[in-house]
Amino acid sequence: MSGPELGRLIDEVDRTVDVQFAAAGDLDELNRLYASLLGRRGSLNALMKQLPGAAPEERKALGQRLNAVKGRVERAREEATARIKRAARDRELSAPPLDITLPGRWRAPGRPHPIMRTLDEIVDIFVGLGFDVAEGPQIELARYNFDLLGFPADHPAMDMHDTFYMAGDPGQNVLLRTHTSPVQVREMLSHPPPVMIVAPGVVYRRDDDASHSPMFVQIEGLVVDRDVSLADLKGLLEVYSRRMFGEATRTRFRPSYFPFTEPSAELDVSCLVCFGENRACPQCKGTGWLEVLGCGMVHPTVLRNVGIDPEEYTGLAFGIGVDRTANMKFAVDDIRAFYENDVRFLGSL
């Protein structure tokens, strides 16, 4: 491009700089204008690339003119930026004042999770019956979780596919507790009879389906004293069932097996949904009964393991799945829904 032609284009840009920057109404528009002039593809940079095409004796003067225009662009940008910010501040100051006394946006108040509400209700029932509440660690030793409770070495619960063992422990001595029975063991080791406790807490098992969760809440109970009998166990759990599920609740005990109790039983209550009158009931599968808990008389071997003479003392024990109890009370099909943090679901319970 010839020197005169390049000079004419420089003058055209120079004449419009002040007008264009004065017309910019906001910072976005200002930045776009600046980029159109001095950006990588801006018009002034494009003219700078044309300098080598001018005559040698014209290049110095043309370069000085280009640099002068660039300086004007920078100054115009600074002035326009200050003007736009000043105008924005003036608009903000002239706006109606904010009334800080107006109420904010309403938020629904928080409340306990359905699982914890159920647990609190169960604990309150047993505390009202004279039980103390005991707690223990969630990371437990196999000695307390299995050995002292009379689990045989080949019991399925001790397998890797049923229990979460801690990494880096080749001896499988440290684990996430599979029940709160270790709390009972620790309590019997540290306190001589009589013992009358409930042990609520989170437990872990390798199980995940519609009726099981790998992490769930359990509460176990223990009574050790002289002359504790199966009749005491039956009467205690019948009182619990009526207070938890209603005075009209019927109960039945079925023989079962647990390594740490003998005899052992499962307690069922009459269906809370169909009351045994609907063969198609999804809650009880048409049986009219719902499994609530496992229970039994403390095995003499367990008492010996913790230093209690089974000839002098007897004990009763029971374990309640709080998640399953909540599942029954709220008629929820999939127990995993309690842990999916769907606020709409949790708020409906």
From Swiss-Prot:
Its EC number is 6.1.1.20. Its cofactor is Mg(2+). Keywords: Aminoacyl-tRNA synthetase, ATP-binding, Cytoplasm, Ligase, Magnesium, Metal-binding, Nucleotide-binding, Protein biosynthesis. Mg(2+) binds at residue 262. It is found in: Cytoplasm. GO terms for biological process: phenylalanyl-tRNA aminoacylation. It is an enzyme of class 6 (ligase). Pfam families: Phe_tRNA-synt_N, tRNA-synt_2d. InterPro entries: aa-tRNA-synth_II, aa-tRNA-synth_II/BPL/LPL, Phe-tRNA-synth_IIc_asu, Phe-tRNA_ligase_II_N, Phe_tRNA_ligase_alpha1_bac, Phenylalanyl-tRNA_Synthase, tRNA-bd_arm. This is Phenylalanine--tRNA ligase alpha subunit. It comes from Sorangium cellulosum (strain So ce56) (Polyangium cellulosum (strain So ce56)).
